[in-house]
Regions:
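Catalytic activation segment of kinase domains across protein kinase-like and atypical kinase folds
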Residues: 120, 125-171
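Conserved SAM-binding loop of SAM-dependent methyltransferases across substrates and taxa
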Residues: 317-329
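Conserved class I S-adenosyl-L-methionine
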Residues: 306-316
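A short, conserved alpha-helix within the catalytic core of class I
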Residues: 396-412
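A conserved beta-strand element that flanks and buttresses the S-adenosyl-L-methionine
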Residues: 389
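Conserved SAM-binding motif I beta-strand of class I
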Residues: 330-335
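S-adenosyl-L-methionine
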Residues: 345-382
Length: 479
């Protein structure tokens, strides 16, 4: 079997991740030997794993594991470890506000604990975080270094660009943080953030201290050290200032971390505008009776299915995702409505649900990005599911997005062996409302044609009409 270095693991000289036999391993180089030993001997590694803040790992002993039989001799190698696998992977350009905030707070929690053990984080990127049962978990064991009390936090600017600034822009500008990462995948610079934030944000001390002050200092060709160091004395912030390294004490580092924690934990998403689907089931023509009838059919369809992971398309608030979760099934719940996904994330976090809520438009899912388009795989290349559920969605795709039924049937068949789908006909009030403002060019959108086209790719397992409506639910198995 071939060993492949992971395409996103090439920047850090401390080591790299590689794949062998569908498993992930991490090589630790000799340049990181002292830090890795300190991480373990100080007790920090044990504490991080105990708190479920860092993935656990197994050290691979030479001669006792077949992996060493396939590795070439490497004079740089110190150790090989096999980290715990977190799947599926997600990235910040797919996260909701509270997901990004929790990932940022995890960094600061880890920093505070690391300082107690004589270490710090040498970088602060959201790509080092994944989510498990609604909670963030750090995945890079090599991000820790020995703390030097005379040196400011080297990752301060990176932390602000990747966590604080996107959150501030969503709070003050209604510019969703996942959209910020789509434009700035490595974090948004301070000068851009300062230009985008409204005037009123200047009266917020956290914004002034972490955004407008460093932006002004960066803009100035010859800033005076006192312009930064005197103002930051109270809060202990650092990063791009002219403050002397010798003056940056452990107390100032703690002040910085605590102040960032206070600022970020106080931020809330801008909820002034209601999400399009906030009241989908309660205040629309779709009644609670419809929802209950649909739930009964759904429960019957999934009762005997052997499935471990489900992709819920157009998940909204995750009502049906939660029903799956109750059966011990892992769910990837996606929707392009950010407030809905954020509410689902909060619930998943509060109840530790095995649901990964992501902001994704299935008609334009996250593409592969990074160097050679290989560092971060596209969404559709990261998911592996047994069942796709697409409830009250097909009319939005066919009529709203002009996607032919043939393309949808083929698409669904490529990504799962089972499909649970709800057909919403033209005489449904929702579809009538959609067609009221546009020409009906969708001659092929009929129940008969839907069944005919989907039968090319799937075998029908079950089919049932939803009482009180003209909608029909289908359970299909891939041919």
């Amino acid at each position: 079997m071939t060993i492949h270095q992971h395409p996103s693991s090439y920047r850090d000289p401390s080591g790299y991740v590689f794949e062998y036999d569908d498993l992930l391993y991490r090589q630790i180089n000799k340049t990181y030997e002292a830090e890795f030993n300190l991480l373990g001997n100080s007790g920090l590694l044990f504490k991080l794993i105990e708190k479920k803040w860092l993935v656990s790992h197994e050290e691979i002993t030479p001669g006792l594991d077949e992996i060493y039989q396939h590795l070439e001799t490497d004079p740089l190698r110190y150790k090989i470890i096999k980290p715990e696998i977190i799947s599926p992977l997600s990235y910040p350009y797919e996260w909701s506000f509270d997901a990004l905030r929790d990932a940022g707070l995890l960094h600061l929690d880890i920093m505070k604990l690391a300082l107690e053990h004589g270490m710090i984080l040498k970088d602060a990127t959201p790509y080092n975080v994944q989510f498990r049962s609604g909670h963030p978990i750090f995945i890079d064991t090599l991000s820790f270094q020995k703390y030097d009390e005379k040196v400011p936090w080297i990752a301060y600017r990176q932390f602000c660009e990747n966590f604080l600034y996107p959150l501030l822009l969503e709070r003050y500008r209604k510019l969703y943080s996942h959209q910020v990462f789509a434009a700035f995948p490595e974090g948004i610079p301070v000068d851009v953030t300062a230009r985008l934030l409204p005037l009123r944000s200047r009266f917020n001390f956290g914004c002034w201290l972490h955004v407008f002050l460093p932006a002004a200092v960066a803009k100035s060709k010859n800033p005076r050290p006192s312009e930064v160091s005197e103002t930051r004395e109270t809060s202990g912030t650092s990063g791009t200032s002219g403050e002397s390294a010798a003056s940056f004490s452990r107390q100032k580092m703690n002040n910085l971390i605590n102040h960032l924690y206070s600022v970020i934990s106080s931020l809330k998403p801008n909820d002034k505008s209601e999400a399009a689907w906030n009241t989908y089931y309660n205040e629309t023509i779709l009644s609670q009776e419809y929802l209950e009838n649909k739930r009964k059919i759904f429960a019957k369809f999934i009762s005997n299915l052997d499935t471990r992971q489900v992709l819920d398309l157009g998940a909204n608030d995750g009502y049906f995702s939660r029903l799956l979760c109750e059966k011990g099934i892992s769910v990837i719940a996606i929707d392009n409505d950010a407030p809905s996904i954020n509410r689902l994330f909060r619930r998943s976090a509060a109840e530790s649900l095995n649901i990964l809520p992501l902001i994704i438009d299935i008609t334009a899912p996250s593409a592969a990005i990074g160097f050679a388009n290989e560092e971060r795989a596209g969404f559709l290349n990261r998911i592996h599911c047994d069942l796709i559920i697409a409830l009250a969605l097909i009319h939005h795709l066919v009529i709203g997005k002009n996607i032919p039924l043939e393309k949808l049937a083929l698409f669904f068949s490529q990504y799962a062996k089972l499909l649970l789908i709800e057909f919403v006909p033209k005489n449904d009030p929702k579809v009538e409302k959609m067609l009221a403002s546009r020409e009906d060019i969708f001659v092929a959108y009929t129940r008969e044609n839907f069944e005919k086209i989907f039968s090319f790719y799937f075998e029908l397992v079950e089919k049932e009409s939803i009482a009180g409506t003209t909608r029909i639910m289908y359970l299909y198995k891939k041919r």
